[in-house]
């Protein structure tokens, strides 16, 4: 249980799984660069079909639909996670849904040749469905195959895959690469290649040992996989912990989404999970990238698109930093630091945006605030909400919890994308004050309600929530408060 050995089979399995995270990031960012070119495609295609030419309102609506339909697919996919992982397992589920990525990529890649707006929109919907499923599968699989002492560091690799995907999409979208009138279908269809690579590699990755033992009762196979992944023969304590959880599961009824909100021992962790997902999407990170190009242009940057890519590089670098910090500082501490730093930068951005017309040097202050804001995001609110959900729940409720948390993330992402342009139009630079208020609310919630899970087994975390529920009915202070410490469980194998 206390192993910190990093083995080749473990790294291989996690790397293959994070291809799904890369796909999510890539398909999130890929639509932005060729916006003008795709609008021209929509206009040309509709003109060929009918007279009179399409109105600007229709074109804007179709473009908005092409962008937003991705999030709609993500909502549906994220809420369907449990349907796959409980029936097929974690690894097989990732393998099966790559068919969606290939189908969606083909539709988008061939939409120009077919002169079909419908193929583009349907392809975005299907790829959104795929990415929504991946946002549940990947953190769950990584969390279940990782040693307790390294679970947070490996869990952060999910976010690293996402930001690398966004960065690659930004780079490929440059006019000198694939962001041209002729090559943009290849830019969208590129998602087929990672899907094929993952399909080829997944058969060589083991199934989650927790799924095999707890769900399938295949103890020997689970033990063999743990020994191979962790590079140690001494996995008896971990196997016993899984067997104890399996026994508890057999005495409980199957956990549904409604049960998560009804049962006292699940209610607090699911509320924490939802709030952490909201803290990611309502932090203002999308607003920062929305404003960044204009700010870089005002500061005299000749090619603001390259500066935006630079912000993406900062995004990636600080996600790597988070990988090394999360097991040292703890999830809760990093999330608090991230939220606090972002709140300060939001205020600084508001002030500098309001004054940059009067003081030209304020544009450089604003650029600095943007880069630091992005860095703080990747230290806490970026990576932590994805993998901490898997830590807060046992094997039984975990799929349903991942579905609810993922759906709340996708839904809030969709709403921010829908409402932010109007908010920015009416509020201008003051829009960041709204995000500052959200960040302060989430900081307070995290400080008082979010436990530290570093170094604790799934069973220990679950028992702590159950203990709080039981003692809470007697008006006593529950043991979950002890988890707000950043001290990990002592290594009993030492």
UniProtKB/Swiss-Prot annotation:
Record GO terms (molecular function): D-glucose binding; D-glucose transmembrane transporter activity; galactose transmembrane transporter activity
Any matching Pfam family: Sugar_tr
Domain of life of the native organism: Eukaryota
Location of Phosphoserine modifications: 485
Biased amino acid composition, Polar residues: 484-494
Region (Important for selectivity against fructose): 277-279
GO cellular component, one term: perikaryon
Keywords: Cell membrane, Cell projection, Glycoprotein, Membrane, Phosphoprotein, Sugar transport, Transmembrane, Transmembrane helix, Transport
Family matches, as InterPro entries: Glc_transpt_3, GLUT, MFS_dom, MFS_sugar_transport-like, MFS_trans_sf, Sugar/inositol_transpt, Sugar_transporter_CS
Sites where the protein binds D-glucose: 159, 280-281, 286, 315, 378, 386
Membrane side Extracellular: residue ranges: 33-64, 112-118, 175-183, 291-304, 353-363, 421-429
SUPFAM superfamilies linked to this entry: MFS general substrate transporter
NCBIfam families linked: SP
Protein name: Solute carrier family 2, facilitated glucose transporter member 3
Source organism of the structure: Bos taurus (Bovine)
């Amino acid at each position: 249980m206390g192993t910190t050995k990093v083995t080749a089979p473990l790294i291989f399995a996690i790397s293959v799984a994070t291809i799904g995270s890369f796909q999510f990031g890539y398909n999130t960012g890929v639509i932005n660069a060729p916006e003008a070119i795709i609008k021209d495609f929509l206009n040309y295609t509709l003109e060929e079909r009918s007279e009179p030419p399409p109105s600007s309102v229709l074109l804007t609506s179709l473009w908005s639909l092409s962008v937003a339909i991705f999030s709609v697919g993500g909502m549906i996919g994220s809420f369907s996670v449990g349907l796959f992982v409980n029936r097929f397992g974690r690894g097989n589920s990732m393998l099966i849904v790559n068919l969606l990525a290939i189908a969606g990529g083909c539709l988008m890649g061939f939409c120009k040749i077919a002169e079909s707006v419908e193929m583009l929109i349907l392809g975005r919907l299907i790829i959104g469905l795929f990415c929504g499923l991946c946002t549940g599968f990947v953190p769950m699989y990584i969390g279940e195959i990782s040693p307790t002492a390294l679970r947070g560091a490996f869990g952060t690799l999910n976010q690293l895959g996402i930001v690398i995907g966004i960065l690659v999409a930004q780079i490929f979208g440059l006019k000198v690469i694939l962001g041209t009138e002729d090559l943009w279908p290849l830019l969208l269809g590129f998602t087929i290649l990672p899907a094929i690579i993952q399909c080829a590699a997944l058969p060589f990755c083991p199934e989650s040992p927790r799924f095999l033992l707890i769900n399938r009762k295949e103890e020997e196979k689970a033990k063999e996989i743990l020994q191979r992944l962790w590079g140690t023969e001494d996995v008896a304590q971990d196997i016993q912990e899984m067997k104890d959880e399996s026994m508890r599961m057999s005495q409980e009824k199957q956990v549904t989404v409604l049960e998560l909100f009804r049962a006292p021992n699940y209610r607090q962790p699911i509320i924490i999970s939802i709030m952490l997902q909201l803290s990611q999407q309502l932090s203002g990170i999308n607003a920062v990238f929305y404003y960044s190009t204009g700010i870089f242009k005002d500061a005299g940057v000749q090619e603001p698109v390259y500066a935006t890519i630079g912000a993406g590089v900062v995004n990636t670098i600080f996600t790597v930093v988070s990988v090394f910090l999360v097991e040292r500082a703890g999830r809760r501490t990093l999330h608090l630091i991230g939220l606090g730093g972002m709140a300060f930068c939001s205020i600084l951005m508001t002030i500098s945006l309001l004054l940059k017309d009067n003081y030209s040097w304020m544009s450089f202050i604003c650029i600095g605030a943007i880069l630091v804001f992005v860095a703080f995001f990747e230290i806490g609110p970026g990576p932590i909400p994805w993998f901490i959900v898997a830590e807060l729940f046992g094997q039984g409720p975990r799929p349903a919890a991942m579905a609810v948390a993922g759906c709340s993330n996708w839904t809030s992402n969709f709403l921010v994308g829908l409402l932010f342009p109007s908010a920015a139009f009416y509020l201008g630079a003051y829009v960041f004050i709204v995000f500052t208020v959200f960040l302060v609310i989430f900081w307070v919630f995290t400080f008082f309600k979010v436990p530290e899970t570093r170094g604790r087994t799934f069973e220990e975390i679950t028992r702590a929530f159950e203990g709080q529920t039981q003692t809470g009915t007697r008006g006593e202070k529950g043991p979950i408060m002890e988890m707000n410490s950043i001290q990990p469980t002592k290594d009993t194998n030492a």
